[in-house]
Amino acid sequence: MARHGDTRSPSPVGSTYSSSRRNRRDDDRYERSRRDDGRSYRRSRSPERRYRERERDRDRDAFRRRDRSLDRRDEDSYRPGRRERSRDRRRSRERDDYRRRSRDRDYRSRREDSRDRARRRTDDSADLKYKSRRDDSRDRAKDAPRSRETSKPSTPAATAAPTEDEKRAERLAKLEAWKQKQAAEKERKQREAAAAGGARSILEEIDRKSGLSPAVSSPQSPATPGVDATPGTYTGKFDPKAIAKSASSTPAPPAVLGNDVAVPPSVKPVTTIPSQVKPKSTTSASATLKAKGNVGGFGLGTKQAADTEKSTATKTLGFGEEESTRRKLERLPTPPLEDAKDVNGTADGAADEDEDDVDMQDGGTEEEAAAAARAAAERREERLQSEAIKAQSNGAESNDTVMGDAPSQEAADNMEVDAQEEEEIDPLDAFMSELAESAPPKKKVGAKFSRTKEQQPEALFGDEHDIDMTAVGDGDADDFLAIANKAKKKKDIPAVDHKKVEYETFRKKFYTEPSDLAQMSDEEAASLRLELDGIKVRGVDVPKPVQKWSQCGLGVQTLDVIDKLGYEKTTSIQAQAIPAIMSGRDVIGVAKTGSGKTIAFLIPMFRHIKDQRPLDNMEGPVGLIMTPTRELATQIHKDCKPFLKALNLRAVCAYGGAPIKDQIADLKRGAEIIVCTPGRMIDLLAANAGRVTNLRRVTYVVLDEADRMFDMGFEPQVMKIMANIRPDRQTVLFSATFPRNMEALARKTLTKPIEIVVGGKSVVAPEITQIVEVRNDDQKFVRLLELLGNLYSSDENEDARALIFVDRQEAADALLRELMRKGYPCMSIHGGKDQIDRDSTIEDFKAGIFPVLIATSVAARGLDVKQLKLVVNYDAPNHLEDYVHRAGRTGRAGNTGTAVTFLTEDQERYSVDIAKALKQSGQKVPEPVQKLVDAFLEKVKAGKEKASASGFGGKGLERLDQERDAARMRERRTYKTGEEGEDEEEKEEKNEQAEERFNKAISSVQSTAAPSLPGVPKGIDLDGKITVHKTEKDPNSTSKNPLDKVGSAVADIHARLSRAGVMRSGVPIDNRGPDAGAFHATLEINDFPQKARWAVTNRTNVAKILEATGTSITTKGSFYPTGKVPGPGENPKLYILVEGETELAVTNAMRELMRLLKEGTIAAADSDARAPVGGRYNVV
């Protein structure tokens, strides 16, 4: 029946609802006419009728409230409507109701009865009244665990059938025999325990301290003669662990010894717990079998006292309370597995008996459980007696006091811990409860549950805890190191041994020379190349240039896309490069800006990819295109898209600044082409231990703007990627500029390349009008406004664009603010902005949303903007290649454009490259610019200036490697580790001699008036000759007494020995005076930059020099600002005094100090030059 307090909470862990669901459902379906018929199957001792009527009234009241809100509030009910309808049908006693079931009826019986059962269990826990057959069939499976948990003594029903009386008499006879046997065994064990009196006293003392009684009485056996025991009312709660054991489908969890049978603690008459009195601590039957021996059973190692009869108290340990369970470290006594089988089998069998046998159902189930428990107790007692004897013998041999199992101490037997039962103890509960226990006298190492030796819980959990902590600590240390090493190697791409990898064969050559080109002679081919903007080729077996798209050997889909894009004829670079690439050759293509280089390498790539098999799952790309800038990568990817759809190919654009997760997702879906920047490609190859993508399928590699890719800023990353690609790949390099030094690096990655140059290397296109003006800084902005005004004054230039280049990010933002104030809508782009802002700005500029764009050199390469008619170099480019690429943003694809460059008077260095570009493109050099060029060349001849090298000269990884190698070699020379061989020493000496000769030659050419390094004070030559002075002592100042000389020498030796190798913070490195050494030298450092002064005065560098040379280095004087001269009587300017015993030692120390000064000065100059920029890019 439904009851109050019903919830939707699942059944407790181990409850009997799960195990007896099938039986309860059967009862619901087939016994509806019986469960509410009002017949009583309970024993006459209970006030059943009054209880039953009261319960029915309450249950009916629960279903009268039909309002959903009231039910939800009062009963936590979710379906009161269904419950009421099903309740109405349930009151019907006709059997026809069962046959005329609706879907709601079945739903009610399955869904709502589960909540009714939970409510009934809550109500029945207080008085355990026997109900109708429906309630009993549902609660029958709970009887067995309840009998193990409660302290209720049970007797056979007085109204049992004659067969039941015979069974009961037989069981009573067996029980009497068993009790006599127990009494004899108890007397024997008490005699054996006489020798353990001292241990008993200790145990009793511990029990008193921990609040335990020396003996705890046990409830009377239900079969004790002469006692008419009545079933006591159960007022406790169910133990979830005991319920779980009975609900398990397999008999693995052992059952509790005795179920409803309590073993008497002694031969004396025992007291019976009356059913009317509620115990102070609600316990189970197994818990009431508690005696002090079970405390010793967990490790105190003492035998139980023989005088347990002293205490007649009925105090029990409250194992029914969850709090008590945590407070006392006790284990529930359980029988072996075979006993559990008997008990569970009895309970399950009773649940499955004939449903018509209602009268004897309850009594039969209870008595069978009791009989099975008694039989199990007999079998267990025999086994425990033999084990106790063995335990005593083992304890005598190991000098351990073993607890004896006397008949009166059956609770101690029940608390015996079996090896098979280890999993039943919760380690956390045991450890926490032990905190409240008194500490044992000593710990036992290697604690282990066994039947023969009782071990202490502290030893068990303490040892396990220590062992686990040690193991975890060691493992964690290793894990942390592994994680740290893994983080260091995060971006390392392992080198691939191509000899061990089997690559698929692929075809490179797709080009077949047309017949009309094959008939052309070499002279005709040379004249054709001359007509095509003067194509220059270098290499073996160079194909003749094509004149139309149909001669390139392309597919129909590709030709259709070319027609749709409006490419009527090939450009010069396309006419020569496409046949060369389609022939399978490596190509270096150099052509002017805006000449169609992108299409020249894309079209052969599509043909190359379509010839190979499709990509399988998790295979990498076939074509790889690397670019130096993110904007160029997005532009190439955009140029690919028209062909990708027609050819059913996929491409991924991977560059830094964008979320890598999106790029990883695109690569995992599969892509034949990847357009990337080198840094992000390395990230993708190293991501997820190389599982994101790989380069095994790559057979076609393109390096766009190749001269920048092989500059020091990119060359290490590019070479790392190229080393992981198969050696027989086809590699194509394209750029508008290609210095000679970059060309030498690029040829290392190519195999017999064909070099194609259209119009010359590093040449501005002739369609571009170049204007170079020399102006002061305050005049440049006014001139810029004039240029923009002239551009947009005519209507034909209404849609024109203007691109303004500056050298620094701060300058770009400042110029943006000024132009916005003047009314020009503009935007800025530089490396300091987020990538999404850079992309959106480029797109808006191309779309004409704003006509003016201010940019650093990140927008100088590859940017293709239609209607771009004006390029202004607001800050002059610092080398030729940058100027060519900046000017090449206009005048593209045959259109005309204008490039204006501003120079200032102090930018003589940059004027040389600009004048060279003007001459190569056939334009006249203005007079002011030529004056700047001549003035700079005169300074170079005089040694006042150094001619700048062509190219970017970025600071890549090679510089870091070189610095590390130099530092390692210095340490080897300093500390003489012995790792270097004689050959290395000879090489080092030769290199040093060569450097000295080179330095002497340079110093003889350089002018002493103008130092070669910025920041070096005048009059100081760091590469000049080092002057060492010999310290002269006044002969009159020394004592003529020989003893004084000996004493001073000894003191000096002791001082040096005690000071050698000692470095303490706050103490000067060496404070010897000018007379400490025979030689000394000075080096003034007052006017050097702060970084240079720090390099020669910090303790780390000075300590290295001291160890290497054995000299004394002292900083003297005072620091004076630049231009201030110390007056008479003041300290001299800051200088370093180096003293040593030999001239060579002082010279070596001075040379090392001067080297540090030189490096510090160079570093200061570099930082000053880079400080205003604040971005990643120097000039791109």
Curated annotation (Swiss-Prot):
One of its GO terms (biological process) is RNA splicing. The keyword Nucleotide-binding applies. Residues 1-421, 947-996 are annotated as: Disordered. SMART domains: DEXDc, HELICc. A motif (DEAD box) lies at residues 704-707. The keyword Nucleotide-binding applies. Residues 24-151, 164-192, 376-385, 956-979 have a biased composition (Basic and acidic residues). InterPro entries: DEAD/DEAH_box_helicase_dom, Helicase_ATP-bd, Helicase_C-like, P-loop_NTPase, PRP5/DDX46/KHDC4_KH, RNA-helicase_DEAD-box_CS, RNA_helicase_DEAD_Q_motif. A motif (Q motif) lies at residues 547-575. Residues 8-20, 152-162, 241-250 have a biased composition (Low complexity). SUPFAM superfamilies: P-loop containing nucleoside triphosphate hydrolases. ATP binds at residues 591-598. This is Pre-mRNA-processing ATP-dependent RNA helicase prp5. The gene is prp5.
